[in-house]
Swiss-Prot record:
GO terms for biological process: photorespiration; reductive pentose-phosphate cycle. RuBisCO catalyzes two reactions: the carboxylation of D-ribulose 1,5-bisphosphate, the primary event in carbon dioxide fixation, as well as the oxidative fragmentation of the pentose substrate in the photorespiration process. Both reactions occur simultaneously and in competition at the same active site. Although the small subunit is not catalytic it is essential for maximal activity. SMART domains: RuBisCO_small. The basic functional RuBisCO is composed of a large chain homodimer in a 'head-to-tail' conformation. In form I RuBisCO this homodimer is arranged in a barrel-like tetramer with the small subunits forming a tetrameric 'cap' on each end of the 'barrel'. One of its GO terms (cellular component) is carboxysome. GO terms for molecular function: ribulose-bisphosphate carboxylase activity. It is found in: Carboxysome. It comes from the Bacteria. Its main location: other. This is Ribulose bisphosphate carboxylase small subunit. Coiled coil: none annotated.
């Protein structure tokens, strides 16, 4: 019986193959269509007990586009290549984070997590 190699899994979409930039943009478009406010966070070693990640700049309050968010993901990826990077979505009605997914893992191909 063939088994998959052991690998840490994090949050939504982590059991799927790595996302391309185009797939990340589609997920961000979904966040925007739902009225969520996107943001980018990074963490060097995300252990289960680590509840707070470092925010990359500020969340995109106002009229953000998927391309603007993707540009920030790329910039965060180039500044922090040894960190896990995720996109998050805030719901300003419920006043909480509603969505998050990993877009970059260290030691992976560029353009994919």
């Amino acid at each position: 019986m063939k088994t998959l190699p052991k690998e840490r899994r994090y949050e939504t979409l982590s059991y799927l193959p790595p996302l391309t930039d185009q797939q990340i943009a589609k997920q961000v478009e979904f966040l925007l269509d739902q009225g969520f406010i996107p943001g980018v966070e990074f963490e060097e070693d995300p252990q289960p007990e680590t509840h707070f990640w470092t925010m990359w700049k500020l969340p995109f309050f106002g009229g953000a586009t998927a391309n603007e968010v993707l540009a920030e993901v790329r910039e965060c990826r180039s500044e922090n290549p040894n960190c896990y990077i995720r996109v998050i979505g805030f719901d300003n009605i419920k006043q909480c984070q509603t969505v998050s997914f990993i877009v970059h893992k260290p030691n992976q191909n560029q353009g994919r997590y």
